[in-house]
């Protein structure tokens, strides 16, 4: 690209946010930051310590003590908790079930937002993915995108992924979990999930991954006057 640009991408799980954000970063020749993985690392640390995710005070203390790092690579990011590679474990069901509760703790968000801003301020263009990037983490980002899709579409996608991974085929259970997480994320007191007023909202329900990436690349060009 001819100049540096910061792209903030928000939205609920199941919108294709992660794969699209990575694809867009590749298309733009930009760095990529998955903030959700950072919340998952804190959640894993909380669970390993035997802390109840609903105990906000204890969760906050754990967040302050945790040591984490992320190595970003085109072929797959690696997440390290205290030097241990936990890239696979943070995607497990136990972490998934607890991450919304842990993420809602103000002390957790305060610590991670600071780290995310530091990471995003580095040289070069960057695509930052999360749930409060355009509203809280990088409110001055020149390009803000909010991906959305119906709960049913997102549940179907996640259930298909589960089946492909050899897990149980249980669409109704997945749909219930999607709706539960949506409620938690949109009603939490600190940094609720919502589109920034100046974000471009893109419904991915009837779009392929490639179509979404192409559309977002065009949006970036329009908003930042950046061309490949």
From Swiss-Prot:
GO terms for cellular component: cytosol. One of its GO terms (biological process) is nucleobase-containing small molecule interconversion. It is an enzyme of class 2 (transferase). InterPro entries: Cytidylate_kin (IPR003136), Cytidylate_kinase_dom (IPR011994), P-loop_NTPase (IPR027417). It comes from the Bacteria. Keywords: ATP-binding, Cytoplasm, Kinase, Nucleotide-binding, Transferase. It catalyses: CMP + ATP = CDP + ADP; dCMP + ATP = dCDP + ADP. One of its GO terms (molecular function) is CMP kinase activity. Pfam families: Cytidylate_kin. It is found in: Cytoplasm. Belongs to the cytidylate kinase family. Type 1 subfamily. PANTHER family: CYTIDYLATE KINASE (PTHR21299:SF2), CYTIDYLATE KINASE/PANTOATE-BETA-ALANINE LIGASE (PTHR21299). This is Cytidylate kinase. It comes from Mycolicibacterium paratuberculosis (strain ATCC BAA-968 / K-10).
